[in-house]
């Protein structure tokens, strides 16, 4: 089974750790949430897992997977603002050599057909987030990393996002999301990593766990 295993990991910049003592395993068929306040190190941890940043210390092991099976929506925006939603999909698909139907790809993240031909710069904040998700999903990665994907989404958008992530998980993939908005992700992840005050606490099973109590106690 594809997996990413982390042992005694410290992440940061220029050998200065931001978060230390990280131990967890990312398995396919799971949604994992990195939960913590802004600036806690969630994005730094994501970038380290993706191989974009060298760890300060510790080990990351990639089992039955490689960088081509990982995708991310981090450092927004990654889309082209002066291209339409449909053109964005076509350009990214062509770059990666993917055979993708742009209309179906945009439909899958609930971008309405009337917006497919509009320039991305004219999309609402929530619709831009959906486009970012669409582009990250094009390669059908085994490990999908999403940084604050709920930003700008209204309640209907959150319902749509949750359904999309669960469906992708149920296809046998791993989804890692980061957020600082506790109430908006309740019921979405299967497990959680609370990142706070330079530490990371992995909760592998959320059944019976009150995330609010745990989060505010750290």
Predicted regions and their residues:
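Conserved ABC ATPase "signature" region
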Residues: 90, 100-115
